[in-house]
UniProtKB/Swiss-Prot annotation:
It is found in: Cell membrane; Bud; Bud neck; Cell projection. It comes from the Eukaryota. Plasma membrane osmosensor that activates the high osmolarity glycerol (HOG) MAPK signaling pathway in response to high osmolarity. Detects changes in external osmolarity and activates PBS2 through the stimulation of STE11 and targets PBS2 to the plasma membrane. PBS2 activation leads to changes in glycerol production that helps to balance the intracellular and external osmotic pressures. Activates also HOG1 in response to heat stress and mediates resistance to oxidative stress. Involved in the regulation of the mating pathway. May be a receptor that feeds into the pseudohyphal growth pathway. It comes from Saccharomyces cerevisiae (strain ATCC 204508 / S288c). This is High osmolarity signaling protein SHO1. Residues 300-361 form the SH3 domain.
Length: 367
C-alpha cells in the first residue's frame, strides 16, 4: 500500500463570511465619502436641471440631448445610494465604473454645448454639468481602483467600517495559503518574498493568514517516493553524499566483522540508493543506513515528536516503522518529508513528517 493512500487530511470546517445585504440607511451614513460626494452630486444636478428648465422655458435654443444626460445622471445617483444602503458596492464596481464613465461623456458633451451658448440661464446649466463632470471623474478614480490602491485606502480610512477588503489581496492570500500547504519551507520563503516585493502583501485584516504551529514542522499533502529520482548535482551535495557513502561503507565493514549473518541480510535488501555522483559502490543499501542510525546515541535524537494519527508501516518497505496516535517519538533529522525516528522500545526507522508534530516541552505531550 502506498503512503499517499494513507494520508489523513486534517478536517477543516468551511468558513463563510456572513454579510448582511438588507436595506439600511446607516450603511450609507457610515461612509463619509459616499455622503459628501453624492450630496455634491445632488446639488450639482439640481443646478443643472434648474438652469436647463429656465433656459428651455424662455424659448432659447437648448440642446435636446442634454435632457437625456441629466436624466441618466439622476439614475446614477439613485443607483449609488441603493448600492450603499444594501452594501453591494463591491459587488457592482465594474457596473458602477462603466455607468459613471458614460455619464462623464454625456456631461462633458453638454458642457461644451452650453458654455459657448448665449444666455445667462444656460450659464447656470453649464455650471451644473461641469460640477457633475468633476464629481464623475472622482467617482471613476475611486470605483475603478481596487480597494488596496493607495487612494482608496486613504479615502476608506475615514469610514466607520474601515478599509474595505480587496478581492486582489484576497486571491493572493488564498494562493499563499495553498502554497503553504503544498510547498517546503524554503519554497514558502521564496514565494512570500516575491509577494512582499510586489507591494500587495501589506496590511490586510479581512482574511486571516494561516500560521504554522511550529517553525520546524514540515507538512506535506502529497508524499512522494523516498528515492531521489532527480538528485541535485551541485558540488556541495556531491561532497556530502560521498562523505556519507564512506561512513556507510565503514559501518558496513565493521558490522561484517562482528556479525556475518546480519551482513548477509543487509546486502540482500533491495531498493539500492545509487545516484549519479556515488562512488560506484552499489551494494550499500538504505538498510545499512538505518542500521547506522540505530547505533546513534540518545544525544543525536535531539527532537521529540508527537504522533497526530496512528500509522501502519508498509509491509513492502523495510525502512518504515509503525506508531500509535499520541505516541512520543525521538527524531534525529527533521529535513524532508521522511524523518528518521526511534520509538520508546528502541525500534528505529523512517516516519512520514505530516503524521507527527514536533513538541517543545513536556506540557505539549499531554495535549
Amino acid at each position: 500500500m502506498s503512503i499517499s493512500s494513507k494520508i489523513r487530511p486534517t478536517p477543516r470546517k468551511p468558513s463563510r463570511m456572513a454579510t448582511d445585504h438588507s436595506f439600511k440607511m446607516k450603511k450609507f451614513y457610515a461612509d463619509p465619502f459616499a455622503i459628501s460626494s453624492i450630496s455634491l452630486a445632488i446639488v450639482s444636478w439640481v443646478i443643472a436641471i434648474g438652469g436647463s428648465i429656465s433656459s428651455a422655458s424662455t424659448n432659447e435654443s437648448f440642446p435636446r440631448f442634454t435632457w437625456w444626460g441629466i436624466v441618466y445622471q439622476f439614475l446614477i445617483i439613485c443607483s449609488l445610494m441603493l448600492f450603499y444602503c444594501f452594501d453591494l458596492v463591491d459587488h457592482y464596481r465594474i457596473f458602477i465604473t462603466t455607468s459613471i464613465a458614460v455619464a462623464f461623456v454625456y456631461n462633458t458633451n453638454s458642457a461644451t454645448n452650453l458654455v459657448y451658448a448665449d444666455g445667462p440661464k444656460k450659464a447656470a446649466a453649464s455650471a451644473g454639468v461641469i460640477l457633475l463632470s468633476i464629481i464623475n471623474l472622482i467617482w471613476i478614480l475611486y470605483y475603478g481602483g481596487d480597494n488596496a490602491s493607495p487612494t482608496n485606502r486613504w479615502i476608506d480610512s475615514f469610514s466607520i467600517k474601515g478599509i474595505r477588503p480587496s478581492p486582489l489581496e484576497n486571491s493572493l492570500h488564498r494562493a499563499r495559503r495553498r502554497g503553504n500547504r503544498n510547498t517546503t519551507p524554503y519554497q514558502n520563503n521564496v514565494y512570500n518574498d516575491a509577494i512582499r516585493d510586489s507591494g500587495y502583501a501589506t496590511q490586510f485584516d479581512g482574511y486571516p493568514q494561516q500560521q504554522p504551529s511550529h517553525t520546524n514542522y514540515v507538512s506535506s499533502t502529497a508524499l512522494a517516493g523516498f528515492e531521489n529520482t532527480q538528485p541535485n548535482t551541485s558540488e556541495a551535495v556531491n561532497l556530502h553524499l560521498n562523505t556519507l557513502q564512506q561512513r556507510i561503507n565503514s559501518a558496513s565493514n565493521a558490522k561484517e566483522t562482528n556479525d556475518n549473518s546480519n551482513n548477509q541480510t543487509n546486502t540482500n535488501i533491495g531498493n539500492t540508493f545509487d545516484t549519479d555522483f556515488s562512488n560506484g559502490n552499489t551494494e550499500t543499501t538504505m538498510g545499512d543506513t538505518l542500521g547506522l542510525y540505530s547505533d546513534i546515541g540518545d544525544d543525536n535524537f535531539i527532537y521529540k515528536a508527537k504522533a497526530l494519527y496512528p500509522y501502519d508501516a508498509d509491509d513492502d518497505d523495510a525502512y518504515e516503522i509503525s506508531f500509535e496516535q499520541n505516541e512520543i517519538l525521538q527524531v534525529s533529522d527533521i529535513e524532508g518529508r521522511w524523518w528518521k525516528a526511534r520509538r520508546a522500545n528502541g525500534e528505529t526507522g523512517i516516519i512520514p513528517s505530516n503524521y507527527v508534530q514536533l513538541i517543545d516541552g513536556p506540557e505539549e505531550m499531554h495535549r
